[in-house]
């Protein structure tokens, strides 16, 4: 997927300058899916080098106090803007997101004091529930260093923060990759199926509780761009693959992002196991009024694909689907697993970015509930309601994105 950033510069008596930055990144598809390339455009309006909202742009154009540099005025940008007060605009995603992807969240926003988003809603958050299928209350040893090279490969490291996923029938692992090396690359990867084990030559990936993510992946990755993740089984023992990042198996995200379910029924939210098998096997089970942290990786320090920043992607299943059913590979007969209707994107890269988007072109199925992003200070609005995505600039069939300017933000299911 190509992710293009367009900066439109305004001036009180200036000339038009349009700068376009191309941030290419691979579209990481799950196994058995064809690679699909798509593009998205992010628009950022700047005045004197600082971002301003679309509302401010349109007001300035209307009263002739602002104009675009070089008179290159984009058409129709103010057509769908509501006359009601709106928070500072975030870059709007204007074309379809591709499915099963890891978006390189990037922007041309320069450092500046965030504009107050007066209409952003403050989230009234209940205490985090412990009913999640992967709740941190069930994790032990999160702060313990992993004993490198000591545990047998037949031992799942649940005493070191990892959460066993017994329903996948992989000995608790979230995914297993049997790899073969050719010089500085891995030239052959065989993905384990139910009943397989973590054995010599395997990279064995694992789930962490909400708010945490795995810290281990080898520096040697797939020769054709495949991602590889987990700890390594070598000579019958489990070994760390990324000890320079952490000697703990699970590390926290940057924090400040949550997911809340107000539906009264279970909802399974599933993170893609990345780097690794790229299947949506990392579960969060939300009960009727649960609030759980949603892990947001730091783009500067977390996994990079060919040097490019990646984000976390979550699949949202229909209500009533359990993590055991929804957080694994589906066959397409039901809108669950990799066929779930909607994805959430979360990442930190020159700002914290949150997205809601259709799992397209895998499916056009609609979710049977709504989602909105609420926060202390958001750059705009983003919600999914009755199968349509809405931002402060109008509606879309593909998705919407906001930046968290300050404070916390929550994806609310309602």
UniProtKB/Swiss-Prot annotation:
Keyword Electron transport found: no
Entry EC no(s): 3.2.1.-
Keyword Transferase: no
Protein location: Secreted, Cell wall; Secreted
Induction cue: Expression was detected 4h after the initiation of spore germination and during mycelial growth.
Temperature-activity note from the record: Optimum temperature is 37 degrees Celsius.
Enzyme kind, highest EC tier: hydrolase
Alphabetized UniProt keyword annotations: Carbohydrate metabolism, Cell wall, Cell wall biogenesis/degradation, Glycoprotein, Glycosidase, Hydrolase, Polysaccharide degradation, Secreted, Signal
Residue ranges, annotated region (Disordered): 115-141
InterPro entries: Beta-Glucosidase_SUN (IPR051526), SUN (IPR005556)
Gene Ontology terms describing biological process: (1->3)-beta-D-glucan catabolic process; fungal-type cell wall organization; hyphal growth
Annotated GO CC locations: cell surface; extracellular region; fungal-type cell wall
PANTHER family linked to this entry: BETA-GLUCOSIDASE-LIKE PROTEIN NCA3, MITOCHONDRIAL-RELATED (PTHR31316), SECRETED BETA-GLUCOSIDASE SIM1-RELATED (PTHR31316:SF0)
Family, similarity comment: Belongs to the SUN family.
Protein name: Secreted beta-glucosidase sun1
